[in-house]
Amino acid sequence: MENLMTSSTLPPLFADEDGSKESNDLATTGLNHPEVPYSSGATSSTNNPEFVEDLSQGQLLQSESSNAAEGNEQRHEDEQRSKRGGWSKGRKRKKPLRDSNAPKSPLTGYVRFMNERREQLRAKRPEVPFPEITRMLGNEWSKLPPEEKQRYLDEADRDKERYMKELEQYQKTEAYKVFSRKTQDRQKGKSHRQDAARQATHDHEKETEVKERSVFDIPIFTEEFLNHSKAREAELRQLRKSNMEFEERNAALQKHVESMRTAVEKLEVDVIQERSRNTVLQQHLETLRQVLTSSFASMPLPGSGETPTVDTIDSYMNRLHSIILANPQDNENFIATVREVVNRLDR
């Protein structure tokens, strides 16, 4: 008997499992006979096909329960994250309603001092940035003598009295009543939207929980389970197809971007060449203006007696051309002189 126990080996089903897994699997299959020797129990259990089938089903159920627990933990973390709230990135805060008909709010003594001294200090030291100016004015206010500081405080008190009187009169007008109704309607709409969003979130969480519960409640190896697997496989195929289409689109867009980048680089090279060409032409034009000015400096225009300068050479040449075309017979001598000057320029 001892030789049989020492020579017997565990079947492959238990060869790779540790002690804790063996105890869990045996508990799942319902083996409640601790007094039976281990070798004989293992041999008889592995020879029984019903035991192997029950063991595999128990392992599947255990893996499904662990997946369900992980899903519940993930859902709990998402709920906690949504409860923390916060202003989502990308959203814009709506500006509060502003009553344009309301009286102007009063200014404090410190604000009056800041408004008065800020422009003076900015005009005196324009290179100082705005935060530094504010800090300097704060130090100046703290060191201001009490009698000078009291002047700003008295002005603030008078402004506050003015505001209270105007506000009391404004609250009796129809414009204030209209603004109050708008504010109340906006608050009601805001609370209604918040309730609707909260209800939609709750419904979505409930629907997700029901779907997950319905998925985990499907018995394995049934027609419903097979249909569910087929639906998941069809969904995965559709997602793979969509993914391939998007990848093809991205590749085409990438090629288009590369071609556009090449075209832009070519245009930039052309722009640089045109700029250098314009620079050369501008230099040539300036040289020509100087030569014409020096050549025609001793030739005043008939009638006006105008002589050219570097700044007026363009208008001088236009008027010279008009005189030559208008009265060539009356200005033959002048035209002959112009021809001589031009001939010297060609040489």
UniProtKB/Swiss-Prot annotation:
Assembly behavior: Interacts with DTNB.
Bias kind Low complexity: ranges: 55-66
Single GO biological process annotation from the record: regulation of DNA-templated transcription
The organism's place on the tree of life at top rank: Eukaryota
Organism: Homo sapiens (Human)
Compositional bias (Basic and acidic residues): 72-82, 182-211
Keyword Plastid on entry: no
Protein name: High mobility group protein 20A
Keywords carried by this UniProt record: Chromatin regulator, Coiled coil, DNA-binding, Nucleus, Phosphoprotein, Transcription, Transcription regulation
A molecular-function term among this protein's GO annotations: DNA binding
InterPro entries: ChromReg_NeuronalGeneExpr, HMG_box_dom, HMG_box_dom_sf
Tissue specificity statement from the Swiss-Prot or TrEMBL entry: Ubiquitous.
Stretch list, region Disordered: 1-113, 179-211
GO cellular component: nucleus
Ranges annotated as biased composition (Basic residues): 83-96
Entry annotated with the keyword Phosphoprotein: yes
In-chain residues carrying the UniProt-annotated modification Phosphoserine: S105
Biased composition (Polar residues): 1-10, 40-49
Signal peptide feature range: none
Function (record text): Plays a role in neuronal differentiation as chromatin-associated protein. Acts as inhibitor of HMG20B. Overcomes the repressive effects of the neuronal silencer REST and induces the activation of neuronal-specific genes. Involved in the recruitment of the histone methyltransferase KMT2A/MLL1 and consequent increased methylation of histone H3 lysine 4.
Places the protein is found: Nucleus
Coiled coil: 229-273
Gene3D superfamilies linked to this entry: High mobility group box domain
DNA-binding region positions on the chain: 103-171
SUPFAM superfamilies in the cross-refs: HMG-box
